[in-house]
Amino acid sequence: MDSAADPELASAVVAARASVRARLRAEQAERLVEPFDPALYNHQADLAENILFGEAVGPAFAPARLARQPYLRAVLEAEGLTRPLTEIGLAVARNSVEIFADLPADHPLFDAFSLFPAAERGFFEDLVARQTDAILRRGPAGHRDREALIGLALRYNETRHRFGLIDAALEARIVGARHAFARMLPAPLRGAVEFHDPARVNPAASLEENLLFGRISYGEAGAERRVRALVRRVLAEEGLEDAVYRLGLDSRIDPAATGALAEGAPGPRERVAIDLARCLVREPDILVVAILLEERAPANFEERLAHLRAARAGRGLIVCLPEAADPAALPPFDAVVRVAGNTVAA
C-alpha cells in the first residue's frame, strides 16, 4: 500500500484496524491475533522481526544478509546478545540436523519447517559434528560459523519451532535491543525499515498485517480461517472490498519465497491460477493457454476447459495441448493445428 498515492484508502485501513479489534473482542476471539506492541515480544514473529519491529525495505536488512549486517551486529554486541544468539543458533542446528537426518532434501517437511535450505544441510551437519561450542572458535572459520548460527537464531520462532530456547528474560532483552535498534538507526539506513506504527499504514507490510496490526496466532486451530472471515466481514461493512480487489490485482506474487518464509503463500498451481485469472479479467483479444500432460489427469479437466471456453466466448482462445493429447476426444475446436518440433505438421 502506498499511503502517499492513496491517502484516503490508507486512512480507511487504519480506521478499519479498530473495527477488526472491536469485532475480535465482541466474538471473544482476541487470542487469535497477537497485536504489534512496541513494549512486548510478539510470539508469532521470529526473533529478527521482533528486533526490527517493522518491514525491511531494500537489501540492507534483507533476511538472507541480516546476520552479517554491520549495524544490526553492532546492536546485538552492545546489548550483550551475540553469545546468546550464537548459542540459540547452535541448538537450532543440532535439533534440525537430528530431526531431518533421515529425510530427503526434497521432503515437504524439510521445506516447511527447517530453518535452513536443503542446500545448506551439509554445512550445518559438519558444523554440529566438529564443534561443541561455537563461542570458543577463533579466526575466519569461527567468524563464519557464528554468522551462520546467528542467522539461524534470527529466523527462530519459539511458537512455531518449539525448541524451548527463548524465555521471558530473553524476550525482554530482545525488546530492549528493538528500542536500541530504532533509537540509534543511522540516517543512511532510516529508509531501510518501515516500522510498525498504530497511527499509519506500513507500506512494506501486507494488507492483512495492516488491518490486523498484528499476526494470526500459530497455536490456535482454525485461526487463519476465522480471522480472515472476520476481516472480510469488516471490509464489506466499511465498503472497502472493491479497493482490496484492486490492490490484489495490482500485486505481484513473489516466486522466490521458499521454506518457512513461504508458509501460507500460494504454491505453483495457485500462482498459475492467479495469473490466468488476471488474464481473463483483462479480456485480451487473444488468450494462449498451455496445458501440461499431468494437468489433463484430474477428473474435472474437461469441465475446467469448458468453463475456460465459455469465459472466452466470442474472443480468441488458443489451447496448446501436449503431444499425447487427443483433440478428437474433446468438444470440437474451430481449428486444430499439429506441430512437430518447430514445424506445422497438419
Where do the protein language model's features map onto the residues?
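ABC-fold ATPase nucleotide-binding domain signature/coupling loops
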Residues: 1-50, 55-69, 83-210, 214-232, ...
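Long, internal scaffold/assembly segments composed of regular secondary structure
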Residues: 71-83
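Conserved catalytic loops of ABC-family nucleotide-binding domains
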Residues: 283-285, 298-331
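Conserved beta-strand-loop-alpha-helix hinge in the C-terminal portion
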Residues: 328-346
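Well-ordered, non-membrane alpha-helical segments in soluble/globular domains
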Residues: 68-72, 227-231, 299-310
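Structural motif
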Residues: 289-293, 320-324, 340
